Amino acid sequence: MIDIKLLEQLCLCNGISGDEGNVRNLIINEIKDCADDIKTDNLGNLIVFKKGKKSAKSKLMVSAHMDEVGLMVTDITSDGYLKFDEVGGIDRRVLPGKRVCVGRNGLNGVIGVKPIHLTNGDEKTAVPKMNDMYIDIGAESREDALKYVNYGDGINFEGDFKINGKTFVTKALDDRFGCYVLINLIKSEPEYDMYFTFVVQEEVGLRGARPAAFTVNPDFALVIESTTAADVAEVDASHQVCNLSKGATVTVMDRATVYDKEMISAAFELAEKNNIAVQYKRAVAGGNDSGAIHQSRGGVRTLAVSLPSRYIHAPSTAANLDDCESVLKLVKVLSDYIAGGNLAKGKTV
């Protein structure tokens, strides 16, 4: 069973790229009594060692990123409105009218844009540019705003966690669900010794994963992610990357990584053997920390296992609880299989 309370805590914890401290502290608090070693590196990555029942025959690193997409204050107008830019890739179409939390104190604000009745021609239907939007915090002047916020302050989307049957909607599922999976594995009794990395700044260029992988120096890596589903209205089946309620998603190739073929085969064989729902990601698109990890040192054999998610990189993301279970079960059996030495070290295919 998925621990809904913990997953909700992780998703609603604010932590855009470069400001992951609250998320890291939450994770440490969850694992401090069951992890054998916990270190935080200079960039903010959390590197955890968990002793298993047996010594590992292959060194495995299981990884997820702590950061979420968001915004950052870049300027403050003379009349107290905040100008901003994106932190990570965000669909601008969904921003106007969204409620946000500004700075570490979580000051409430709302994203505004020129009122529709004052627009003309193509302006009425055009997607607003970042420069044309602002955040209203109720300040009356720049001086007034500076009492509460400063240049460079992070801006998080205000979120909640709602469940409707097997479907749930929340913010920051990318990649707090991955963090949830790692926490679950650390709390369990793995068959073999394993390393776990909760990394920073994935959304702005895979920046934390490289030093984390360099430090651990694994033979194999599993990256736990969320990936776009696109199984929505008006999208032809041939363009649906993966589907909700169809299980864990395994990627063959994306814009940053060509994944290890033996690891892919092992994932599907173990899924069939253990009656775990699994599907292929049916598009070459996007990327994740695998892109940095697999190039570390002399190379790391890597696979990404993802949760199908609708409306990813937006203030609200939808996913399926059965898929969550499938990802968790697959990662558990696959991690024990790899750490147990069932795949030869080095490239064999």
Language-model segments: which ranges?
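N-terminal hydrophobic/helix-forming segments and targeting peptides
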Residues: 1-349
